[in-house]
A protein has these predicted regions:
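Auxiliary alpha/beta "docking" domains used to position bulky ligands
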Residues: 1-107
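Immediate flanking context of iron-sulfur cluster ligation sites
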Residues: 99-109, 153-164
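Iron-sulfur cluster-binding cysteine motifs and their immediate structural context
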Residues: 113-138, 157-184
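Loop/turn-rich, solvent-exposed surfaces of beta-rich toroidal or solenoidal domains
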Residues: 177-178, 206-227
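Amphipathic alpha-helical scaffolding segments comprising HEAT/armadillo-like alpha-solenoid repeats
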Residues: 186-189, 199-203, 230-241, 260-261
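Short coil turns that connect the paired helices of HEAT/ARM alpha-solenoid repeats
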Residues: 203, 208-213, 239-248
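Structural detector for internal amphipathic alpha-helices that build alpha-solenoid repeat scaffolds
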Residues: 218-228, 250-259
Length: 261
């Protein structure tokens, strides 16, 4: 490949059960593939999506991007609320403008809002500790650490089933775009707890096939249900406690045990 094209897709923050980043990321993935096909057809050059390159560390070296203490990339005007895709081209493509990109400065200094807001203290003075991040353990197929289970579906924690954006919500660099936050979700908690074939298909279409794993969805949903309204969902949690899935059954049994306290 002789040229690289970085595609940026901004999105509006929101979602309670499912963070809007994940649907935006899936949409960006498909848009990048369509763009590659279009470049190949209209420009007569080979174009393909580069999935083997890590974009976050690449962007840290580019002056247009800032980097937060949460290790996320930031851009002027949209903060950290964007998805990235990279295309590799066999030949450079003429651009309409050579205007310089705005410099992305992120004066974190001694702000510390993200570190103070993180419920698991994953952002420290020495850097970001991914093993402490709730998102790191979500939908992994393994049981979440016990100290994190009470935070799923809780206003004090992630509030949802997939995604934790607390550090982004409180960041001053996201102040403007946070004005457009919505609580809209594509699924209800009841739908996720049932997780029918239709729900899985919709889930795959919106978030991607990689996330459409029934047991992994249920393992997160049962924690959210138990923390949100344990009595309302007790019967469903009891049924899921018999699941052959280790993570799902352990999460359900944990919630039932803690309901009795």
């Amino acid at each position: 490949m002789r040229a690289l094209v970085l595609l940026i897709r901004p999105y509006l923050p929101g979602g309670r059960l499912m963070d809007h980043f994940y649907s935006a990321s899936n949409a960006a993935y498909h848009a990048a593939k369509e763009m590659a096909d279009r470049i190949a057809a209209e420009c007569g050059i080979r174009a393909e999506r580069c999935s083997n390159l890590k974009l976050k560390p690449m962007c840290r070296r580019h002056p247009s991007f800032g980097t937060g203490k949460n290790t996320l990339n930031y851009l002027p005007g949209i903060g950290s609320r964007f998805c990235m895709e990279l295309l590799g081209l066999s030949e450079p493509v003429d651009t309409e403008s050579d205007a310089p990109y705005p410099k992305g400065e992120l004066p974190c200094g001694d702000c510390g809002r993200c570190a103070a807001a993180c419920p698991t203290k994953a952002i420290t003075a020495d850097g970001f500790v991914k093993e402490r991040c709730i998102r790191f353990h979500m939908m992994s197929g393994k049981p979440m650490p016990e100290e994190m289970r009470g935070l799923v579906g809780s206003d004090a924690g992630t509030r949802g089933v997939l995604g934790c954006d607390i550090c982004q919500r409180v960041c001053p660099a996201n102040t403007e775009i946070e004005k457009y936050r919505t609580a809209e979700d594509a699924f209800t908690l009841e739908e996720l707890l049932e997780c029918t074939g239709d729900t899985l298909e919709r889930f795959a279409a919106l978030y991607g096939r990689n996330y459409a794993n029934r047991n992994r969805i249920l393992a997160q949903a049962v924690l959210a249900a138990g923390n949100h309204d344990p009595e309302k969902y007790r019967e469903q949690i009891q049924q899921l406690a018999q699941s052959p899935s280790p993570a799902l059954s352990e999460h359900a049994q944990y919630m039932l045990k803690n309901m009795k306290k």
